[in-house]
């Protein structure tokens, strides 16, 4: 053990190890996912002893909680930046790119407006001085005019190629009903849910859905199939669905 954070820096995890200007650095998140901060440890010897420093914390920024768990990166133009995530509960974990600068061989991350040596996360900043690669917008909508699913889609569990068919000729996606295991108690355990990450906290989703039950004699009761359903879902540990 080269550093024990139980007293002052609890929940040390996700560490990165660097060497710069003769110092060895261990950069780690501390304090837990929702309300933590970014800790920096440095020493001339990789086995310590280590000095400790807080390079970024939530501070007065009430919209970016727990800014930590990331990595220092530098550009070919000599700029320093820090990538980290923010936990936003049901919305997931979003990625931030924070400006950074070295002060007395400590990395101050974000904007240190009050001059205390600890940066606060920013929500807007001048982009890195790098060659332009054009505008990039992750795909959200899909007309299903390809024989493959777009990268914006993901399954709720390990998938099978027999669950779907991309009908590019007619711009349609066909999903097949899948018999679930007997011990499945709710949709959280169902693997064949086709999902996307939420694009933003407030959005509208529309889809044209045609439900064609598998009308076989073995599963037909009063002209309805037992157990089959389809529709749209807001999926998570809690979920809500509009379904047939």
Where are these regions (language model features)?
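Structural motif
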Residues: 34-42, 91-98
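Extracellular glycan-recognition regions
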Residues: 98, 105-244
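A short, structured loop/turn motif at beta-sheet edges
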Residues: 21, 42-48, 75-77, 104-106
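Short consensus segments that form the blades of beta-propeller domains
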Residues: 30-33, 88-91, 221-222
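Blade-edge beta-strand/turn elements of extracellular beta-propeller
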Residues: 1-10, 40-63, 108-113, 135-142, ...
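Repeat-solenoid scaffold signature
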Residues: 59-103
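Hydrophobic core segments of beta-strands in well-ordered, beta-rich domains
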Residues: 13-31, 78-86, 144
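Beta-rich, blade/repeat-based domains predominating
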Residues: 7-22, 63-77
